[in-house]
Curated annotation (Swiss-Prot):
Protein name: Malate dehydrogenase, mitochondrial
PTMs per UniProt: Acetylation is enhanced by up to 67% after treatment either with trichostin A (TSA) or with nicotinamide (NAM) with the appearance of tri- and tetraacetylations. Glucose also increases acetylation by about 60%.
Disease field: Developmental and epileptic encephalopathy 51: A form of epileptic encephalopathy, a heterogeneous group of severe early-onset epilepsies characterized by refractory seizures, neurodevelopmental impairment, and poor prognosis. Development is normal prior to seizure onset, after which cognitive and motor delays become apparent. DEE51 is an autosomal recessive form characterized by onset of intractable seizures and hypotonia in the first days or weeks of life, and severely delayed psychomotor development.
Protein family according to the UniProt entry: Belongs to the LDH/MDH superfamily. MDH type 1 family.
Amino acid sequence: MLSALARPASAALRRSFSTSAQNNAKVAVLGASGGIGQPLSLLLKNSPLVSRLTLYDIAHTPGVAADLSHIETKAAVKGYLGPEQLPDCLKGCDVVVIPAGVPRKPGMTRDDLFNTNATIVATLTAACAQHCPEAMICVIANPVNSTIPITAEVFKKHGVYNPNKIFGVTTLDIVRANTFVAELKGLDPARVNVPVIGGHAGKTIIPLISQCTPKVDFPQDQLTALTGRIQEAGTEVVKAKAGAGSATLSMAYAGARFVFSLVDAMNGKEGVVECSFVKSQETECTYFSTPLLLGKKGIEKNLGIGKVSSFEEKMISDAIPELKASIKKGEDFVKTLK
């Protein structure tokens, strides 16, 4: 039922080329010079939904901004370099996207990124809490299962926490699930929608194939293999790139899809549904990804898990201890900060 509410996968990207009097979102990308940041910034610049695009990084942002600024779309682009320029980058923003951080290399898990990326995310979100406390915060930086609790705790410290405006971007898991199911069934991937719940690492990634639109069936061995491929798809890319990075282009696409859906909802479009890792009461985990109905002020309604198969139910049970540990790790990290 939940997946029936969601529009087909590529609709948000297609819709970003529509026209509306409200297409004036001010979006900031923090980590704009990186492997995800550059293609993400390109996709955002290409959208008429965006009127102002501010780019931040600790290196190369003036060049990235100059390059993008020549593109014949309306979004005004400006680059900001280094911590002293971050406040100006954030002022007046409606949406902040954070792909900043170090990428995975072969043999690394998303959790191996924790020590470096936790500090980066805590620093950037503290600036957001100070300079654009009302903005929607979309965190791409891994491990998302920990960086979202970090973001929440930082906002609490600054007294501006709103759980309806902090999102862990798990959209790439949905994009991959849609693609892989479509490949196996000979379908158009743009017409497939698979909700993916849980978290954004390994076995915490739980594709609900039983809720796929259109309905699909797989024998158990194929279903197990498909689920495993969705869960380890990021590692598949890391290995294929052989040390030259992780999933950047597909992640940029997924990040843009989420931002466009969010801006559509902020503009008053009804029925916009995306999965995201957020503060949640759906399970015993304090954060959990489920389909969300988005609205003008962020999360309008958590649509929950819905009806699942016994195979999916077991995956949820198996994921909870790992998710709880990752969440606690993020929360504990913020306690160590001055």
